[in-house]
């Protein structure tokens, strides 16, 4: 199917079959579409509403074209904490901080991420502020995971085919299909994920996409306060994919043994602010930031198999911060990226 035919279909509110979506998305990702066609397609898909089958097909193309990171067969518990972003709440870099706590707890992490698109600080922005080198080869990223238990998969380096859609995405300035399929396309093939989404209506569908793609254990989350993380200020809706089955439920901060706090206690003005909060939490200060990081790192420890349930995952995450293990893992990561870049 060519793009013109696809545009005609979606403007008539008709869904694309998996084969049709695969063909269209491959055309976009290999430079066969004009900027106007790409922009029209993305807006048309958003207005129509992306289906599970369409998202799965798009993610499969992204995975196929990605620059892979091969960590070997010993890392079957590999976890990613990358979310969609786009919640516009301006909180600290929770998923990035959670990655280092999780790695300190013995679970290998392939943290997929980028610079800020909608938030005040993206994963890449934060890690550069820490002094890390992000522009590493795939082999160097894999080696970083082997040495430190965590590596950063900088999206522009691993999804170079995305360059064809960068211009239209920036000019559109709104959430598109790419926000949804990016976190579904981990270049290291992580089959375990904590994945925050920007709207509650996407919790179940994204879990269904990962079910179709063969993931092992995933929590897709969105909080009632709008946060695309597990929140300390409101209940969080979760779709859990495990053993091929999806279960939906809601957890409160109290359910997880968390101290509730308003989101303004974890709101940042920029990257420096975020880093200061994370360093304070990693030094053992029982601030709201520690609770928010523990909530999400605890979930990642759970999907990685290091905790039997969410509540005990949260307890373990706190221990890893108060003991200094998370801070040490971050320091080792920064030093290792510099060494591998030489």
From Swiss-Prot:
Biological process, per Gene Ontology: L-tryptophan biosynthetic process
Pathway: Amino-acid biosynthesis; L-tryptophan biosynthesis; L-tryptophan from chorismate: step 2/5
GO cellular component: cytosol
Residues annotated as binding Mg(2+) 2: 228-229
SUPFAM superfamilies documented for this protein: Nucleoside phosphorylase/phosphoribosyltransferase catalytic domain (SSF52418), Nucleoside phosphorylase/phosphoribosyltransferase N-terminal domain (SSF47648)
Binding residues for 5-phospho-alpha-D-ribose 1-diphosphate: 83, 86-87, 91, 93-96, 111-119, 123
Residues that bind anthranilate 1: 83, 114
Primary enzyme class: transferase
A GO molecular-function descriptor: anthranilate phosphoribosyltransferase activity
Alphabetical UniProt keywords: Amino-acid biosynthesis, Aromatic amino acid biosynthesis, Glycosyltransferase, Magnesium, Metal-binding, Transferase, Tryptophan biosynthesis
Cofactor info, note text: Binds 2 magnesium ions per monomer.
Chemical reaction(s) catalysed: N-(5-phospho-beta-D-ribosyl)anthranilate + diphosphate = 5-phospho-alpha-D-ribose 1-diphosphate + anthranilate
InterPro entries: Anthranilate_Pribosyl_Tfrase, Glycosyl_Trfase_fam3, Glycosyl_Trfase_fam3_N_dom, Glycosyl_Trfase_fam3_N_dom_sf, Nuc_phospho_transferase
Annotated signal sequence range: none
Residue sites binding Mg(2+) 1 per the record: 95, 229
Cofactors (names): Mg(2+)
Domain of life: Bacteria
EC number(s) on file: 2.4.2.18
Binding site for anthranilate 2: 169
Family per record: Belongs to the anthranilate phosphoribosyltransferase family.
Protein role: Catalyzes the transfer of the phosphoribosyl group of 5-phosphorylribose-1-pyrophosphate (PRPP) to anthranilate to yield N-(5'-phosphoribosyl)-anthranilate (PRA).
HAMAP family: TrpD
Subunit structure: Homodimer.
Protein name as it appears in the record: Anthranilate phosphoribosyltransferase
